[in-house]
Curated annotation (Swiss-Prot):
It comes from the Eukaryota. InterPro entries: Hypoxia_induced_domain, RCF1. Signal peptide: none annotated. Residues 103-137 form a coiled coil. It comes from Podospora anserina (strain S / ATCC MYA-4624 / DSM 980 / FGSC 10383) (Pleurage anserina). PROSITE patterns: HIG1. Keywords: Coiled coil, Membrane, Mitochondrion, Transmembrane, Transmembrane helix. It is a multi-pass membrane protein. This is Respiratory supercomplex factor 1, mitochondrial. Associates with the respiratory chain complex III/complex IV supercomplex. PANTHER family: HIG1 DOMAIN FAMILY MEMBER 1A, HYPOXIA-INDUCBILE GENE 1 HIG1 -RELATED. Residues 161-172 have a biased composition (Basic and acidic residues).
Length: 218
């Protein structure tokens, strides 16, 4: 039965385990009715037989038999109607119960469909949540990888800048040492020239003036 509150649940019935009663088709239902009310089909057969005999007597021209068969047909029809009314009154309680059970069966089927629909929605919701979690994990891993790559690139740039700074300092130190050595060599050479020997006069680099030609008048 349904999983609702106890107050909404129908009372148990002896038909609950009778699946054949709920799942019978039209032909099975007619057979069940014939078994429950056998006088009704008997009255129908008597009516058909009386009508057939009346037709045959009419073809033969036997008017007395025709009248007799028509009376028999009316009696058979009346018997059928009485059987139907009596059967309806006798099985009224059972039919009412069957109708209620049919309604309960319909409610049960509707509740089962509703519960199945809810379970399907819950399953879809769980699948969507699992998919969303996987997507979030992938995004997180991608972000972590991107962050690690960025940190490594920054560290590599810092190391390269440090190496360039050290190389610049080394070159600057070497250039300073070379200039200092050159300056020391020049000073020592000058001191050696002054204290080690006579100072030479600077050579006159001015070119000698060419003598002018004598005046022919002198």
């Amino acid at each position: 039965m349904s999983n609702g509150p106890l107050s909404n649940r129908p009372l148990p019935s002896s038909f609950d385990s009778n699946d054949d009663f709920y799942n019978e088709n039209g032909f099975q239902k007619v057979l069940r009715r014939l078994k429950e009310e056998p006088l009704v089909p008997i009255g129908c057969l008597l009516t058909v037989a009386a009508f057939t005999n009346a037709y045959r007597a009419m073809r033969r021209g036997d008017h007395a038999k025709v009248q007799k068969m028509f009376r028999a047909r009316v009696a058979a029809q009346a018997f059928t109607v009485v059987a139907m009314v009596a059967g309806g009154m006798y099985y009224q309680a059972d039919r009412h119960k069957q109708k209620e059970l049919w309604k309960l069966r319909q409610q049960k089927d509707a509740e089962e469909k509703h519960q199945k629909w809810i379970r399907e929605l819950e399953a879809r919701d769980a699948e969507e949540k699992a998919l969303q979690e996987r997507l979030d994990k992938r995004r997180k891993r991608a972000a972590e990888r991107a962050g690690g790559t960025g940190t490594e690139s920054v560290a590599a740039q810092a190391r390269a800048a440090l190496r360039e700074s050290k190389a610049g300092k080394t070159e600057t130190g070497e250039a300073t040492s070379t200039e200092a050595n050159q300056a020391d060599g020049g000073v020592l050479g000058s001191l050696g020239g002054w204290f080690g020997g006579s100072k030479k006069a600077p050579e006159d680099t001015t070119p000698a003036l060419e003598s002018k030609p004598e005046d022919p008048k002198n």
